Curated annotation (Swiss-Prot):
This is Isoleucine--tRNA ligase. GO terms for cellular component: cytosol. It comes from Agrobacterium fabrum (strain C58 / ATCC 33970) (Agrobacterium tumefaciens (strain C58)). The gene is ileS. One of its GO terms (molecular function) is isoleucine-tRNA ligase activity. PROSITE patterns: AA_TRNA_LIGASE_I (PS00178).
Length: 967
């Protein structure tokens, strides 16, 4: 052995990976430093400057509520938005993200009132604008907190200039939008039964309620027939209801001409109250036996009762003796079924939408019958009966009965009504029922339906162009892209079935309904007055409306101050958020209208998507968005709703502190986000494991590229294997771009992770490690591989950058220390020549044979006949001409990572290794012949052929000589 060989440490002659990019990520420590670096370097402004003049892409941010720390739903939502905007920015668009906040409304009022109570302060004694200032300050504080939390998630946007609904300009624009609606005749004051929160003392929209199971009283009530054909004289119609307190509001009974009804006679009675033997009652035939059982009666069927007979009936109110001395007609209603109850529906137009519709749709018929069609106001805003409920109102013995108290608990109304029905001998039966009932989503307390004067927007009024707000909205839905597609039908069904839009709320913290109205509800339309209002709001905010002397200031001297009343209700906060497109998309020069995308949770079909659609269609005739993307809710690992009581809440702050924001982001990217997702410790660990593999792939590339001198090898000079990798990059480029366009991030992450793990780490990198580590500096194969790995790195890191902004930034700066940020880069443009389907088809065959060889090697390893695949020199028997042809000219030993390999075109031995799915390939195992190379560890017969380096192969000896010459 020569002196050179004796002294040489071969490990120093290898091109082993070298990088400062650590295997251990340390994301919780590094990510905050990266956020600070981005802020210090002004990354957001650099992104805007780099995108100047490009086509705009706008994802309009649905505003979270400025109240409390962010939760996992916020994190999911913001990460999805961030990935979308980043992906468009890196594909040649100007994708500006402007975060926003919803600032008005009841939850903030509650917090301020809570603080008042703690200090013994009475809210009613506080000047309204002082109260509003405290609400404003509260919201501003939480905007600051949430901004920092969003930035910690890696969200990039204009946090220095967000939009807020309490900004003076925003308040002026919101008021201006209302005035547009008023000017077009779409705004009106009316009375309708609406959902009312007694606890919060305000009207609620459908979007502000959630449904919970409750147990309620249910009663069956007799309505004595007062006027009918002689054959039905002396009988009673029986209704069923789960809201006994609404009986004072009853004005009609609904039946259906599609239901079969019958007259029944009581044969026996075993009850303490209710019908007695001989009484005659009308029921839906299908439900009579069930009703009889509830009342402990036996019935005898007398005869059928036709719908024509029912339509001619007028009943007495069951509480007529208390002052309800008016006729109760029977009305044919489409909403009536014989699925439950009695087949008759108690109709209280003050307390239900269907009841209201049934009553108002029959006004002409009722008036022709001499029936008063005025709708009463039986319940006040505190849940007490009014004088419109004789026997239960303020003048009743014991005072006014109450439906619900200030804490959302059931009052005494049900029991007092039931006792009165028993006293009148008109209670048929009573019981308890568990059913779904609306609750306020804020207070979590039940709501009631009550008739109140409110401000509405017409859904079905003709708007002068042959359209209505409903028809415009439905047309707009048809022109909108929905992801998932099911969202279209969901929103369509809501618009088709919704009532007129209730805009008014009886609270203080919000944008006022800044109009003047007379006693009849007629709205003053005067452009000079409107201009004064909007000018004041722009300068002072909506507080100007509540300031002393506001009425005189805005009306001026042109109008009778006694005639015109200043409306002091505020707007539904959904109207606020429904107007964000005006003062964000239209008014900001860095945005555009309409937005390309609105993205929110699936509950926003009845919330922000809904209100934005209505507002924009009312004022502009189309939706403010081109596409609507929805995500589901985050459950725990068992699929249960996350709640503090279950102890299963996953806070994003905790995940970031323990694992890092990129882990949370990877979880979002790997879920079917449009459905409900699951999250917990095991799922987080799964994502940590996937992240580590991905990180190690990037780390290996960085280490290998430490030896890259930037040389780019011409495509024509590349070996087939490198061309195959570039073909796969070409295919992945389409998957990535199509995936980002379709908002299908799971498809992208699955494709990239599989590519990194299966095609790179377990195939291409494995095959090329020997070349990359051991070949001579001048080796074309080594240089070609480095050239391709450089392209792999650029593609993978930029493709992943929208999803994993922290990790990709770290990797990019490790590779390009002089670069500012990966996020200022663009996705690489892929040359058309990279796509090579014929080459892929050929290599599919090669890989098929390789699968059999690696399977055979695994058996040899398991049986401990070899330790490494380099100890093997298998014989591969192939009885398939296509497979054989594919291997022609290939260094198949290199591809299989063996020291040698022999390919034979025959059937092979019967006892050889084979796989069922590749039946015509048989592997016969043999050990490699020769000596193990001290440098590459391959076993070859030419070790010792070079006297200068007698313990290495000829290839390695040549490489060593070349390396020595370079020193």
């Amino acid at each position: 052995m020569s002196d050179t060989a004796e002294k040489l440490d071969y490990s120093t002659t290898l091109y082993l990976p070298q990088t400062d990019f650590p295997m251990r990520a340390g994301l919780p420590q590094k990510e905050p430093e990266t956020v600070k670096r981005w802020q210090d370097m002004g990354l957001y402004k650099k992104l805007r400057a780099s995108a100047a003049g490009r086509e705009k892409f706008v994802l309009h941010d649905g505003p979270p509520y400025a109240n409390g720390n962010i939760h996992i739903g916020h994190a999911l939502n913001k990460i999805l938005k961030d990935v979308i905007t980043r992906s468009f920015q890196m594909r040649g668009f100007d994708a500006n993200y402007v975060p926003g906040w919803d600032c008005h409304g009841l939850p903030i009022e509650w917090k301020i009132e809570e603080a008042y109570r703690a200090r013994g302060k009475n809210k009613d004694e506080v000047p309204v604008n002082e109260f509003r200032k405290e609400c404003r300050d509260f919201a501003a504080g939480w905007i600051k907190v949430q901004s920092e939390e969003f930035k910690r998630l890696g969200i990039e946007g204009d946090f220095e200039n967000p939009y807020t609904t309490m900004n003076f300009h925003a308040e002026a624009r919101i008021a201006g939008e209302l005035l547009k609606i008023a000017r077009s005749g779409q705004l009106y004051r009316g009375s309708k039964p609406i959902m009312w929160s007694v606890v919060e003392r305000t009207a609620l929209a459908e979007a502000e309620v959630e449904y919970h199971d409750v147990e309620s009283d249910m009663i069956w009530v007799k309505f004595p027939v007062k006027d009918a054909a002689p054959a039905l004289s002396g009988v009673s119609v029986v209704i069923w209801t789960t809201t006994p307190w609404t009986i004072p509001g009853n004005r009609a009974i609904a039946f259906s001409s599609r239901v079969e009804y019958g007259l029944f006679e009581v044969e026996s009675a075993q009850n303490d109250f209710g019908p007695q033997t001989g009484e005659k009652l009308i029921f839906a035939r299908k439900l009579a036996d069930e009703a009889a059982a509830k009342a402990k009666l036996t019935f005898k069927f007398v005869r059928d009762v036709k719908s024509e007979e029912l339509a001619a009936i007028t009943c007495a109110h069951p509480l007529a003796s208390l002052g309800y001395d008016f006729p109760v007609p029977l009305l044919d209603g489409d909403h009536v079924t014989d699925d439950a109850g009695t087949g008759f529906v108690h109709t209280a137009p003050s307390h239900g939408r269907e009841d209201f519709d049934a009553w108002t749709n029959s006004v002409r018929t009722l008036e022709a019958r001499g029936i008063d069609t005025k709708i009463p106001f039986p319940v006040d805003d505190a849940g007490f009966y009014t004088e419109d409920a004789p026997g239960f109102g303020p003048s009743a013995e014991g005072g006014a009965a109450r439906v619900m108290d200030d804490n959302g608990k059931k009052g005494d109304a049900n029991e007092r009504v039931i006792k009165a029905l028993i006293a009148a001998n008109n209670l048929f039966a009573r019981g308890r029922l568990k059913h779904s009932y609306p609750h306020s989503w804020r207070s979590k307390k039940p709501v009631i339906f009550r008739n109140t004067p409110q401000w509405f927007v017409y859904m079905d009024k003709e708007l002068g162009d042959g359209t209505t707000l409903r028809s415009r909205s439905l047309d707009a839905i048809d022109q909108t892209r929905f992801v998932p597609a099911s969202g279209q039908n969901r929103l369509r069904a809501m618009i088709e079935g919704r009532p007129d839009w209730v805009l008014s709320r009886q609270r203080s913290w919000g944008v006022p309904i800044a109009v003047f109205a007379d006693e009849q509800g007629e709205v003053l339309v005067d452009e000079a007055v409107n201009a004064r209002i909007l000018e004041a709001f722009e300068a002072e905010g909506a507080d100007a409306w509540f300031a002393e002397g506001a009425k005189e200031r805005f009306l001026g001297n042109d109008h009778d101050h006694a005639k015109w009343q200043q409306v002091m209700d505020i707007l539904d906060v959904w109207f606020d958020s429904g107007c964000t497109h005006t003062f964000t998309l239209e008014d900001r020069p860095d945005m555009k209208w309409p937005a390309d995308v609105y993205l929110e949770g699936s509950d926003q079909h009845r919330g922000w998507f809904h209100s934005s659609l209505l507002e924009s269609c009312a004022t502009r005739g189309r939706a403010p968005y081109n596409a609507v993307v929805t995500h589901g809710f985050t459950m725990d690992e068992q699929g249960r709703k996350q709640s503090k009581s279950l102890g299963n809440v996953v806070a994003p702050q905790d995940v970031m502190k323990e694992s890092g924001a990129d882990i949370l982001r990877l979880w979002v990217m790997t879920t079917d986000y449009w459905e409900d997702q699951r999250l917990g410790k095991a799922i987080i660990q799964t994502n940590i494991d996937a992240y580590r593999k991905l990180r190690n792939t990037v780390r290996w590339m960085l280490g290998t590229l430490a030896h890259d001198n930037g040389e780019e090898i011409a495509y024509a000079d590349l070996p087939e294997l490198e061309k195959l990798v570039l073909h796969r990059l070409s295919e992945l480029d389409k998957v990535v771009r199509d995936g980002y366009d379709a908002f299908d991030f799971k498809k992208i992450t699955r494709a990239l992770i599989d590519f990194a793990n299966v095609e790179l780490s377990a195939f291409y990198f494995d095959i090329r490690k020997d070349t990359l580590y051991c070949d001579a500096p001048s080796s074309l194969k080594r240089r070609a591989s480095l050239s391709v790995i450089a392209k792999l790195f650029d593609c993978l890191v930029t493709w992943l950058a929208p999803m994993l902004p922290f990790t990709t930034e770290e990797a990019w700066l490790s590779r390009y220390p002089d670069a500012e940020s990966v996020h200022l880069a663009q996705f690489p443009e892929i040359p058309a020549e990279w796509k090579n389907d014929a080459l892929e088809a050929k290599w599919e065959k090669i890989r098929k044979v390789r699968t059999v060889v690696t399977g055979a090697l695994e058996v040899e390893r398991r049986e401990k006949r070899i330790g490494s695949s380099l100890e093997a020199a298998p014989v591969v028997h192939i009885a398939d001409s296509d497979l054989l042809a594919a291997l022609s000219g290939q260094d198949f030993a290199e591809i299989c990572i063996t020291s040698a390999i022999t390919v034979v075109g025959d059937e092979g031995p019967a006892d050889g290794f084979r796989l069922q799915e590749v039946a015509k390939v048989v592997v016969e195992q043999k050990l490699a012949e020769g000596v193990k190379c001290a440098r590459s560890w391959r076993i070859t017969t030419d070790v010792g052929s070079d006297p200068q380096y007698p313990d290495v192969s000829a290839r390695d000896a040549a490489a060593l000589r070349e390396l020595a010459a370079l020193k």
